[in-house]
């Protein structure tokens, strides 16, 4: 009986050894699959346009000494989507008083921007005819997208902080990297 008992113990030990050796290998392959982005395509979430901005909700931000317009972001419209897009309404004002209001998005991961809609005088939105993702230009006279991305929204291809952190940076004119703006 002790031989059978010993045989069962050896068999159990062998089974346990096999069991404990296999899961790490399986776990490793699952771990690698979880981070394998090849073949996975990014998908943008459905868009909900915000209300057009009120002047009391606008946060002005500095773009550059060569900017030909002044810019402000509507704090009520700022959102961070589950798709990794920061969406916001921006108001561009010329020295003569003309205003352009647009609802836009920035993807930190790809350093791209997109215009979703433009405000009409009656407070409604007109969808952009060119709603494609485009590279952000940092060296134009009006480089508001580059300023928002590098100074307030993005760091190392990731969103830098949550909604409230970004709003605090904008309100205090405290860029992420003090050498790049402010």
Where are the predicted features?
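Bacterial N-terminal signal peptides that target proteins for export
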Residues: 2-12
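Bacterial N-terminal signal peptides
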Residues: 11-22
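N-terminal secretory signal peptides
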Residues: 27-103
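Short, flexible beta-strand-to-coil junctions
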Residues: 90-98, 108-109, 118-121
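A short, surface-exposed beta-strand/turn
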Residues: 102-112
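A short, surface-exposed interaction/processing loop segment used at functional sites
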Residues: 110-136
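C-terminal partner/receptor-binding element of secreted or periplasmic proteins
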Residues: 126-182
């Amino acid at each position: 009986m002790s031989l059978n008992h010993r045989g069962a113990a050896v068999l159990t030990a062998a089974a346990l050894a096999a069991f404990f050796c296999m899961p790490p290998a399986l776990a490793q392959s699952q771990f690698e699959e979880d981070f394998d982005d090849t073949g996975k395509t990014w998908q943008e979430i459905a868009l909900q346009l915000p209300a057009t901005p009120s002047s009391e909700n606008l946060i002005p931000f500095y773009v550059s000494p060569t900017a030909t317009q002044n810019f402000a972001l509507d704090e009520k419209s700022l959102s961070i989507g589950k798709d990794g897009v920061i969406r916001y309404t921006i108001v561009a004002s010329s020295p003569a008083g003309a205003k352009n209001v647009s609802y836009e998005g920035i993807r930190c991961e790809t350093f791209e921007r997109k215009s979703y809609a433009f405000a009409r005088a009656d407070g409604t939105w007109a969808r952009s005819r060119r709603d494609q993702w485009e590279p952000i230009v940092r060296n134009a006279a009006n480089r508001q997208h580059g300023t928002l991305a590098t100074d307030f929204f993005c760091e190392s291809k990731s969103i830098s902080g949550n909604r409230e952190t970004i709003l605090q940076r904008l309100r205090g004119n405290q860029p992420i990297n003090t050498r790049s703006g402010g």
